[in-house]
């Protein structure tokens, strides 16, 4: 491969300590310092959480600029890069950033005269910015840098892959504190060896796991939270394969899965499922024909859901709409609701695809309980018991009453019942009414012929008779009270 000339910028960074006098950390986990220069992430060893934090770490950052012609072009390109320092404590689950410091890479590598004192590689002190979990004064970072721009020979392939890969070098320990420059001869040997060239281009350093992520197993909630972190933190935690998370509402999910939907059919088998339900279907038809209060209920087209086992199931939501839909009359609606409350669930197969399909349909529960002969007999027996209890209670009250007053009340009750029945039915003509005469309280006889001749209906005659009767009762009661007082 042909060799081309390029400029290589190397930065030797020596981190000494982080000081913050008078500050105590509430958490006791270890702390490390993360550095990002030239897009390369490196970190120091962990130290105890007690200020001052003494690191004494040395690391080297290198980057090749194949398009640069002179060092001025390299310095100009360094203006678009940022050097970032992060002081991170290993607080579960993903660590907590205590303070940060960022500066333009050009100013960081080549500081001005006001930032250094004495030699170029002397110590520097910068104030970091507090973020969270740190109270008091801001911490101060002590470090020193050595920057070198050299000319090197690289292959054209490396020039094309410079933007895709990053060249890393392990921290080199030098006894005299000087940066060891690689010669072109050593680079030529490395380029010839395929094994060494494979290790020259390593994976990106930010793809390597952090110390905190190695020591803790993230939970599902932590994974979702880590997806919302900054871009730099997401790069450091890329080995976890968190992936993009899209939070959806629960309403977007369907209530149940419909396996197969058949077109509606007018046949009765589609309404009631398999032919094994013929008895239940006949009972349902009898209910519609025998009970007039359910006349407004009509059968509708239902969607049939086919299970993997071949059995048809009715859509439960269609059945609910059929029973709970508003009706023209109020009585059927009340009866339907009453039947829904007192219905008992029937047995269904347990191999349905959805738990909703395991429930018995409202129609099955409706007519399976009310059309069976034992239930009908039980209902009739209960009604008879209630009627007998009311008759016994009425008979007991009649025994306590006066026989004469009871005869009068019975006569008036019969007149009231017949007259109300005639008046409530406008189609009931006078020719259809039974012929007969009625005796009033004063011995007068009132018949249908007398009503037609005098032009008075039974209602006003009944009201007049009731007035007379209550007036006589009142007079008798007053006379009995006065007679009792005189006797005393």
From Swiss-Prot:
Asked if the Swiss-Prot or TrEMBL record annotates the protein with the keyword Cell membrane, the reply is no
Main location group: secreted
- Describe tissue expression: Testis-specific, in spermatocytes.
Question: Quick check: keyword Signal in the entry?
Answer: yes
Q: Where in the cell is it found?
A: Secreted; Cell projection, Cilium, Flagellum
**A GO BP term, please?**
spermatogenesis
Q: Please give the InterPro entries that the UniProt record associates with this protein.
A: SPATA6_fam, SPATA6_N
User: Cross-link Glycyl lysine isopeptide (Lys-Gly) (interchain with G-Cter in SUMO2): located at?
Assistant: 248
* Keywords associated with the record: Cell projection, Cilium, Developmental protein, Differentiation, Flagellum, Isopeptide bond, Phosphoprotein, Secreted, Signal, Spermatogenesis, Ubl conjugation
Q: Where is the signal peptide?
A: 1-17
* Domain of life of the source: Eukaryota
Q: Could you give one GO CC term from the UniProt record? A: sperm head-tail coupling apparatus
| Region called Disordered, residue ranges | 175-225
| Residues the record lists as Phosphoserine modifications | 217, 219, 265, 274, 325, 343, 346, 354, 424, 465, 487
- A molecular function GO annotation: myosin light chain binding
Compositionally biased, Polar residues: which spans?
A: 200-220
Q: Assembly and partners?
A: Interacts with MYL6.
What PANTHER family does the record tag this protein with?
SPERMATOGENESIS-ASSOCIATED PROTEIN 6 (PTHR16435:SF3), SPERMATOGENESIS-ASSOCIATED PROTEIN 6 SPATA6 (PTHR16435)
Family designation: Belongs to the SPATA6 family.
Q: What does this protein do?
A: Required for formation of the sperm connecting piece during spermiogenesis. Sperm connecting piece is essential for linking the developing flagellum to the head during late spermiogenesis. May be involved in myosin-based microfilament transport through interaction with myosin subunits.
| Protein name stated in the entry | Spermatogenesis-associated protein 6
Organism of derivation: Rattus norvegicus (Rat)
């Amino acid at each position: 491969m042909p060799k081309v000339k390029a400029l290589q910028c190397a930065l030797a960074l020596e981190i000494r300590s982080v000081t913050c006098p008078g500050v105590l950390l509430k958490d006791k986990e270890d702390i490390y310092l993360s550095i990002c220069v030239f897009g390369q992430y490196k970190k120091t060893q962990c130290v105890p959480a007690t200020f001052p934090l003494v690191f004494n770490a040395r690391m080297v950052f290198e980057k090749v600029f194949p398009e640069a012609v002179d060092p001025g072009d390299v310095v100009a390109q360094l203006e678009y890069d940022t050097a970032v320092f992060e002081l991170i404590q290993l607080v579960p689950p993903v660590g907590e950033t205590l303070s940060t410091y960022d500066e333009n890479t050009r100013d960081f590598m080549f500081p001005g005269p006001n930032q250094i004192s004495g030699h170029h590689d002397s110590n520097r002190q910068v104030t970091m910015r507090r973020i969270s979990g740190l109270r008091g004064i801001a911490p101060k970072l002590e470090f020193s840098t050595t920057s070198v721009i050299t000319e090197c020979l690289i292959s054209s392939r490396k020039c094309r892959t410079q933007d895709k890969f990053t060249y890393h070098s392990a921290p080199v320990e030098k006894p005299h504190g000087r940066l060891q420059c690689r010669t072109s001869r050593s680079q030529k040997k490395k380029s010839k060896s395929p094994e060494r060239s494979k290790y020259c281009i390593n994976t990106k350093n930010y793809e390597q796991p952090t110390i905190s992520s190695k020591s803790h197993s993230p939970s599902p909630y932590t994974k979702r939270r880590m997806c919302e972190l900054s871009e730099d933190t997401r790069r450091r935690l890329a080995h976890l394969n968190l992936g993009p998370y899209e939070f959806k509402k629960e309403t977007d999910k369907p209530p149940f899965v419909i396996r197969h939907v058949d077109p509606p059919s007018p046949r009765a088998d589609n309404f009631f499922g398999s032919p094994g339900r013929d008895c239940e279907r006949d009972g349902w038809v009898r209910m519609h024909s025998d009970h007039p209060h359910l006349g407004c209920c009509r059968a509708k087209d239902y969607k049939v859901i086919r299970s993997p086992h071949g059995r048809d199931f009715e859509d439960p939501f269609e059945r609910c709409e059929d029973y709970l839909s508003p009706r023209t009359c109020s009585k059927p609606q009340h009866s339907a609701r009453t039947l829904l409350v007192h219905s008992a669930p029937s047995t269904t197969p347990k191999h349905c695809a959805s738990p909703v399909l395991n429930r018995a349909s409202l129609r099955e529960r409706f007519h399976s309980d009310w059309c069976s002969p034992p239930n009908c007999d039980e209902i009739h027996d209960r009604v008879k018991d209630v009627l007998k209890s009311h008759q016994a209670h009425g008979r007991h009250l009649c025994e306590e009453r006066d026989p004469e007053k009871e005869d009068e009340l019975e006569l008036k009750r019969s007149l009231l019942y017949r007259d109300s029945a005639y008046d409530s039915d406008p189609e009931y003509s006078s020719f259809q009414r039974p012929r007969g005469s009625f005796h009033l309280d004063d011995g007068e006889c009132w018949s249908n012929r007398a009503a037609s001749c005098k032009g008075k209906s039974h209602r006003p005659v009944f009201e007049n008779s009731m007035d007379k009767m209550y007036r006589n009762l009142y007079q008798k009661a007053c006379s009995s009270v006065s007679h009792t007082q005189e006797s005393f």
